Structures are given as structure tokens and as C-alpha cells.
Amino acid sequence: MEKKHIRPAASAFLLMVTMSLLSTALSFFVGPVCEDMGFGRGSFTLYYSLMVATGAFSVSFLGKYMNEKGVRNIILVSAVWCGVGFLGLSFCRALWMFYVVGAAMGFFGTSCVYLCANITVQQSYSARDASMVMGVVMAGSGIGGMVWSNVVPGIISSFGWQMSYRILGVCWFALAMLSWLILGKQDLSGAVGKAGAVASSGKGVFRTGKFFMVFSVACILTMASCISQQLPSLLGGMGYDAAQVGLMVSVMTAFVAVGTVLEGLCCGKFGVVGTMISVTVFYAVGYGMLFFPGMIYVALAGLAFGSGSLGTLLPIVVRHVFGGRDYAAVWSMIMTVTSITSFLATPVWGMVYDVCGNYNPALITMPVLLGISVVLLMTLFRKKT
């Protein structure tokens, strides 16, 4: 691969590492901040929910801008915006201050940065190459998460939570600016349209049957991925002790990192149709294997590969079905849908346990929904063909 072709991938990879500052590093501040300020953990973490909510709102508008103007301006804004946001968190002294700063950061935070990375890849590579590159790029969030998980607790212990927020602000600004510099002054706007099929432009695409099918598949995959928040509790209820649960969660995290790369490679080699359907079937099998203790690692692999497909394969499906012209608009809308679905579905998993005393109703329902998702994908790809 030529140097000029490596730059977009390297830039997108760095953006995913940057994104992990919000998705992973912030979780280590919950204990220190709540203990120091006397906040309840549930009340305090609401600021992160607000961050996610405003991010879901903003990407529905940013996608169209990125498709027309490219992503460099948005990366630059995010570098400054969230860098200052981290600084603002360090000066918060009341819950409402955290809520305001968190909500503001969300506009150019996690969802925005992920969208920038995604569109950079889709605009810079052919459909075949984009699938392989996206698998590697998605691993950046996992690698970044592992780094921050080992570094951030020590920083907080040494400097306190206020100074640590400022240090992370500098890290965010530096990484985002490095990504911006590596990307260079490339004219990415409209490039994806040259690589993909031409689709009908405008809001009419959101009223088509194929959009409804992609919308439904995205919702089902997101609902299925919400098991990750309940996984430690689920495994504990199956009789595993804390050490075993910790090991299994770590193994699943490793499966996700490996799975995203493998999915990208398989998509490039065998095509998006077979890969997406196969992974979704494996996802359903993973849920089924949770009822068989001897197959627990097969179950974890299925769950990991399935959840990884949201970020790796679903964007390729959108490009395959809608082509390049509508990609940014459709994908930003799908991101909004998945964010809202996650926001609504996550507490439902907990409610199932509260009402039934176990997760069995959800574990039985999800393979059925994933089966429906497979049927929708087959119909979608047949219509496309």
C-alpha cells in the first residue's frame, strides 16, 4: 500500500484511540469524583448519558456536512472542543456543572469522532479495501482502551481527579491534532461516491424499503450488543466466581479485538453478503450456547464477533446497499438510531432480571430476533443483486 493510502488509515486509527479517552478513560473518574464531592454514582454518571444523547443528536446533522466538505474541519473542531471540555470538567463543583459540560462535549465527542474515522475510511478506499481497513481501524478503540485502563488509574492516584481531567484534555487535543495532520490536505468530499454505486440523493432514501430493513437490522444488532453491560452479572448467576468472570470478560474483549480484524479481512476476501450473514448466524448461536456451560467460550466468541459487526460490517452493508452518494447521510442516521436503541435497550436487560430473577427471557428472545435479522439481510441483498 502506498504511503498516501496509509495516511487515511493511520489517521482513522488514531481517531479511534482518541475516542477511547471518552469511552473508557472517563469510567475511572467515577469513584474518585463521587468520594471527593459526595455525589451518588447514579446521579454523577448521568452526565455521560447526556454526552451520549447529544452525540446521537449531532451526528444526524454532521454526516451531511462531512459528505460535502470532508472530515478535516470536524476533526479540528473536536480537538479543541473536547480538549476544552476536559478542562471544564476539572473545574466542575456541582452536578449540574458536570451535566452541562458533559452534554456540550457530546456534540463533538465519541459519536462524532467515530463518524469521522468511518467516513475517512469509506471516502479513501474502494469497497473491498475499506472493509479490511475498517477492521484494523476499529481495533484502535480496543488498543486505546487497554492503554488508558493501565495508565489513567495511576495518573488519578498521583495527581488527583482535577489535574487528571486536564491531562486527558491535553492527550485528546494532541491525538486529534496528530490525526488531523496525518490526514493532510486531501480532498475527500465526494470521493466515496466514485467508489460506490450511485444512489438516489435526498431525504427520499429514508422512506425506502431497503432503509427500513437496514434500520431494523441495526436495531436488532444493537439490542443484542447490550448484553455486554449485564455480562458479569449473567456469568456470576451461572455459578462462576469473581476471578472466572473477570477472565471471561477479558477473553471476550480479546475476541472483540481479533473479531473486528477478521471480519474486515473476510469481508474483503469473501464479500460483505456472506460475511455479514455468517456473523449474524454465529451471533445467534452464541446466545444459544449460553445455556450450555461447557460451550461458554464458544458463546463468548459468538457474542464478541456479533457485537464487533456493528462497527466493522454494518458500515460496509450501508455502503453496499446505498452506494457512495448517500453513505454519509444514511450512516449518520443509523448511528443516531443505534445510540437511541442502546439508550433504551440497556435498562430493559436489567428490568428483565428484576422481574424474572434471571436473563432467560432475553436470552431466548435474542436468537429469534437475530434470525429475523438474517432473513432481512438475505432479502436486502437479494433486492440489491
PLM feature segments, named:
Residues 7-41, 58-62, 149, 227-233, ...:
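Extracytoplasmic
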Residues 26-30, 206-263:
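Extracytoplasmic gate region of multi-pass secondary transporters
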Residues 33-34, 65-66, 147-159, 164, ...:
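Interfacial helix-cap and linker-helix signal at transmembrane-aqueous boundaries
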Residues 57-95:
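Conserved MFS/SLC helix-loop-helix module at the cytosolic interface between two early adjacent transmembrane helices
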Residues 58-70, 260-271, 353-354:
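Helix-to-loop junctions at the C-terminal end of transmembrane segments
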Residues 111-125, 309-322:
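Intracellular juxtamembrane helix-capping segments at the cytosolic ends
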Residues 137-184:
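Helix-loop-helix hairpin linking two adjacent transmembrane segments in secondary transporters
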Residues 252-262, 267-317:
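C-terminal transmembrane helical hairpin of 12-TM major facilitator-type secondary transporters
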